[in-house]
Design a protein with these regions (language model features):
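N-terminal extension/subdomain marker
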Residues: 1-98
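Short, solvent-exposed loop/turn and secondary-structure capping segments
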Residues: 26-27, 57-58, 112-117, 177-178, ...
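Gly/Ser/Thr-rich loops at beta-strand to alpha-helix junctions
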Residues: 20-23, 106-112, 170-174
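Structural recognition of the beta-strand scaffold that forms the well-ordered cores
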Residues: 12-17, 44-49, 100-104, 163-167, ...
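Terminal, contiguous helix-loop blocks that mediate binding/assembly
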Residues: 6, 118, 125-374
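Hydrophobic, aliphatic-enriched repeat segments that assemble into extended interaction scaffolds
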Residues: 88, 92, 96-104, 110, ...
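Surface-exposed loop and adjacent secondary-structure segments within mature catalytic domains
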Residues: 48-72, 99, 103-143
């Protein structure tokens, strides 16, 4: 007997949930939202979930609130590029489609290499979390294992095969991370700040992602409005929509302006930061470039190219941060966004607390493309 080939669908979306961590309850809550969101949608929503204390599964969420276990796996490391690559390939084989989307769901820390995180505790507790803070996300964590951005880029298609890549994870709207991932998808939806563990409202956004022409701006608006209109203690969110085929031009414009500027003389304390770390790692990209001097025409060209790259952004007045540095707002756990362009950047500087990050940053494709060497 020969099985017939799978029937090609209009769109297949894979949600890859690396939930072998403290976000497992939020993962299942999001799956419940997906069941609601797919109530009357004709398309393939495939969920790989590796839950803490459970068995990794490949699920199909269908209209009518139906959830089917397609495959189960032995215990495995979902924060492994080999597992991620296998799941992507398996999903495309089982559910071929005219177009594909990918949601990466877990913890996240932008471009910062996983190996730096534990070591940085010896450097002024750079990554120390506030013990009273609610959960936020990264990408990706399975127990003590993580995926570096360079490895993630290698595990994803290099021909923008995905129509979109959505990060339901903290800090992934970093220009360094997204530049390295620019060939994975046509559009990337990501937040340059922290995302609360409740994440995106999948019941609301799935109809937009499965539309004949996906409505990415509406997905972003719905995400921020979900928190903006929330009555919870933490009604905060930010997001950017990035057109990836503009990122090379952004790097070129950044290089031209950066060469004319004096970044070492910038007063970093005056640059919009996006978290409450003891020493800030994520700053607003445009605000930083506005404070390093340089040729006015080249700056205008950079700012114009940035508007072509970040085609939509939205944010609440404040954003939440789980870190333990000074803050404002409820319980002093927030950061006020006086300016926001939709992308973050690392600001290179000679500080002992940043030594390991500084060394790693010089090796990022963004730093090399822009000519950031110090």
């Amino acid at each position: 007997k020969i099985d017939p080939p799978p029937v090609k669908s209009g769109r297949t979306i894979l949600v890859y949930m690396a939930a072998d961590n403290n976000l497992v309850n939020s993962a299942w809550q999001n799956v419940d939202q997906m069941l609601v969101g797919m109530e009357s949608i004709d398309g393939n929503l495939i969920v790989y979930i590796d839950p803490q204390g459970g068995t990794p599964q490949l699920l199909k969420i269908e209209s009518g609130g139906k959830k089917t276990v397609v495959e189960e796996y032995a215990k495995e490391n979902s924060a492994s590029t080999s597992v991620l690559s296998r799941v992507i390939a398996r999903t495309k084989a089982l559910y071929p489609a005219e177009s594909y989307g990918l949601v990466l769901w877990s913890h996240g820390l932008g471009w910062a290499p996983a190996g730096v995180i534990p070591k940085s505790y010896s450097a002024d507790d750079l990554w120390r979390k506030d013990p009273n803070a609610p959960l936020t996300k990264w990408f990706a964590q399975d127990g003590a294992n993580y995926i570096d951005i360079s490895d993630l880029a290698g595990a994803l298609p290099r021909d923008r095969e995905f129509d979109f890549l959505l990060f339901d994870a903290c800090f992934m709207g970093s220009v360094e991370a997204l530049y390295e991932l620019r060939n994975a998808a046509k559009y990337i939806i990501a937040s340059p700040t922290e995302i609360l563990s409740s994440g995106f409202s999948y019941d609301a956004i799935l109809p937009e992602l499965f539309a004949d022409t996906p409505r990415f701006e509406e997905v972003c608006r719905l995400f921020v409005d979900y928190y903006r209109q929330s009555s919870s203690t933490w009604p905060y969110a930010s997001v950017g929509l990035i057109k990836t085929d503009e990122l090379d031009a952004l790097a070129a414009a950044a290089k031209a302006f950066y060469a004319s500027a004096s970044p070492a003389s910038a007063d970093v304390s005056q640059v919009q930061y996006l978290e409450r770390m003891q020493t800030h790692v994520f700053h607003d990209l445009l605000d930083y470039y506005s404070k390093i001097g340089g040729d006015a025409a080249l700056y205008a060209a950079f700012a114009g190219q940035l508007r072509k790259t970040v085609v939509y952004e939205d944010h609440t007045e404040y954003v939440f941060s789980a870190y333990s540095g000074p803050g404002v707002g409820p319980f002093n756990m927030c950061v006020k966004l006086n300016t926001f362009c939709g992308l973050s950047t690392y600001v290179p500087r000679d500080l002992s607390a940043l030594q390991l990050l500084q060394e790693s940053y010089k090796e990022t494709p963004w730093a090399k493309a822009v000519g950031i060497a110090y």
